[in-house]
């Protein structure tokens, strides 16, 4: 999913 802060350009599955 998201490796770094979802604020960049990854899938916001950190929430």
Curated annotation (Swiss-Prot):
Localisation: Secreted
The record's account of how the chain is modified after translation: Both Pro-5 and Pro-12 are not hydroxylated, and Tyr-15 is not amidated.
Transmembrane residue ranges: none
Record keywords: Disulfide bond, Ion channel impairing toxin, Neurotoxin, Secreted, Toxin
Single GO MF descriptor: toxin activity
Disulfide-bond pairs as recorded: 1-14, 2-10, 6-13
Lineage: superkingdom: Eukaryota
Tissue expression notes: Expressed by the venom duct.
Primary localization: secreted
A cellular-component GO term for this protein: extracellular region
Extra facts: Authors confirmed the assignment of this toxin to the M superfamily by cDNA sequencing.
Note on domains (UniProt): The cysteine framework is III (CC-C-C-CC).
Family in the record: Belongs to the conotoxin M superfamily.
Known function: Probable neurotoxin with unknown target. Possibly targets ion channels. In vivo, intraperitoneal injection into fish provokes paralysis after 5 minutes.
Name used for this protein in its record: Conotoxin pr3a
């Amino acid at each position: 999913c998201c490796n770094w802060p979802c604020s960049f350009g990854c899938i916001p599955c950190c929430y």
